[in-house]
């Protein structure tokens, strides 16, 4: 009896360790860009044909666009939240079929959740657009001006609470301190989970309402993955270049993820800003004063979603683009380093970088690199950056060819491209998604 008990305990422990490792070995894929809504035949149907290719990049999660009716075609000015058939990306049935296809490939799906603000269908007696329609025959999400933040004076009747975050001028800021708002948005999110099959959330403009309020929606909907958009602004010097110390910038991200609690993560805008400056001859930027990575990744890697570009920073908006000729240096960095990397649709399918990105993702997978992998920065100078990850993978960025003899003889090149190279240690590969102990 005792022997069987010990065996069972060992099995349970092994399963728990594997589950923990798999949870950490996450790769996010953004499955759309700013122009995806224009696709003839619908984006959901088009993306359905790409599911297998997306899964082959190593993606464990795919981020899909806002699903509801919206005044803007991209989905970021939502109105009738339950009305998914009015989306420019396709119908509710097509979305559900797409989610099922991803699930068949063991890829979980995140909905882009835009709840900071909302567009009204009708005017009130003042002639102000502040009467909302939920998109159902009943009264769910049918709100009036009472549900708008009192300091959003363009739309509010003054009865709501003050905004708990940054204002959004283009549409009414919703009062998330209102119990009815909390209850009905929670019900809508749970409907997306149970009826549509979504697994988690990407929270748009998450700095528009406080972290404790975001936590309410996370705690009450049980998502497997949550990532918030806290678009922090780097601190710049007088010469227009980023300051060496970006601790205040990444502290904003830390405050949010700690305020929301797990499983919440945040897009690591600090790392993006520093990385895209570093690859332009300033690779010394890729370590902080303590020898760690300089972004959120250096402080809380398990809650840092690293990325090169997205539909805002890149695509046709190009609000803060990564240098186009150095994009693969960006992927060599995020796909071999700690944190949770996010791959952008455009780079895989529109830039013809699928093979290079998939190769790096495979290196990450077969070496068991995960969000909390150990990072040892070996060199960070203007024209060269070299780091070892988990003692198994070495990544070099920059044009300098000679790394100065710091690459051990038992490491061999497994990927290389424009100003990047990746080595792998022989004999230490582990099954995909597992840590090496």
Curated annotation (Swiss-Prot):
Molecular function per GO: alpha-amylase activity; calcium ion binding
Binding site for substrate: 69-71, 76-77, 202-207, 231, 233, 251, 292, 298-300, 311, 317, 396, 401-403, 413-419, 423
Species this chain originates from: Oryza sativa subsp. japonica
List of residues binding Ca(2+) 1: 116, 163, 166, 173, 208
Gene that produces this protein: AMY1.4
Positions bound to Ca(2+) 2: 133, 136, 138, 142
Signal peptide: 1-25
Subunit structure: Monomer.
Misc: Binds starch not only at the active site, but also via accessory binding sites on the protein surface that are important for efficient binding to starch granules and thereby increase enzyme activity.
Family to which this protein belongs: Belongs to the glycosyl hydrolase 13 family.
Lineage: Eukaryota, Viridiplantae, Streptophyta, Embryophyta, Tracheophyta
Name of the featured protein: Alpha-amylase isozyme 3E
Cofactor annotation: Ca(2+)
């Amino acid at each position: 009896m005792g022997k069987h008990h010990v065996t069972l305990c060992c099995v349970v422990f092994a399963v728990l360790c594997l589950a923990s490792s798999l949870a950490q070995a996450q790769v996010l894929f953004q499955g759309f860009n700013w122009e995806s809504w224009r696709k003839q035949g619908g984006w959901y149907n088009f993306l359905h044909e790409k599911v297998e290719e997306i899964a082959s990049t190593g993606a464990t999660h795919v981020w899909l666009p806002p699903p509801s009716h919206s005044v803007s075609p991209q989905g970021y000015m939502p109105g009738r939240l339950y009305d998914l058939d009015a989306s420019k990306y396709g119908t509710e049935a097509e979305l559900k079929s797409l989610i099922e296809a991803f699930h068949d490939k063991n890829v979980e799906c995140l909905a882009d959740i835009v709840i900071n603000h909302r567009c009204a269908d009708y005017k009130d007696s003042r002639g102000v657009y502040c009467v909302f329609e939920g998109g159902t025959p009943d009264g769910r999400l049918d709100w009036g001006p009472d549900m708008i933040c009192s300091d959003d004076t363009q739309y509010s009747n003054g009865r709501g609470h003050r905004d708990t975050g940054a204002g959004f001028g283009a549409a009414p800021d919703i009062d998330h301190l209102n119990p009815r708002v909390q209850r009905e948005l929670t019900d809508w999110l749970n409907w997306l989970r149970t009826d549509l099959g979504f697994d988690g959330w990407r929270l748009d403009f998450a700095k528009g309402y406080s972290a404790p309020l975001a936590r309410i929606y996370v705690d009450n909907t049980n998502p497997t993955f949550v990532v918030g958009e806290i678009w922090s602004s780097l601190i710049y010097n007088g010469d227009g270049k980023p300051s060496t110390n970006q601790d205040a910038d990444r502290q904003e991200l830390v405050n949010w993820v700690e305020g929301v609690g797990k499983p919440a993560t945040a897009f690591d805008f600090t790392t993006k800003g520093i990385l895209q400056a570093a690859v332009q001859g300033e690779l010394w930027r890729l370590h902080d004063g303590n020898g760690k990575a300089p972004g959120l990744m250096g402080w809380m890697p398990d809650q840092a979603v690293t990325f090169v570009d997205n539909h805002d920073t890149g695509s046709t908006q190009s609000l803060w683009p990564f240098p186009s000729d150095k994009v693969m240096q960006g992927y060599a960095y995020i796909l071999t380093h700690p944190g949770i990397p996010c791959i952008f649709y455009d780079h895989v399918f529109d830039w013809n970088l699928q093979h290079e990105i998939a190769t790096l993702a495979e290196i990450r997978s077969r070496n068991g690199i995960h969000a909390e992998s150990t990072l040892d920065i070996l060199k960070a100078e203007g024209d060269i950056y070299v780091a070892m990850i988990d003692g198994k993978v070495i990544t070099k960025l920059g044009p300098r060819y000679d790394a100065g003899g710091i690459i051990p003889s038992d490491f061999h090149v497994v990927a290389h491209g424009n100003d990047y190279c990746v080595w792998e240690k022989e004999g230490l590969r582990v099954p995909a998604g597992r840590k090496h102990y």
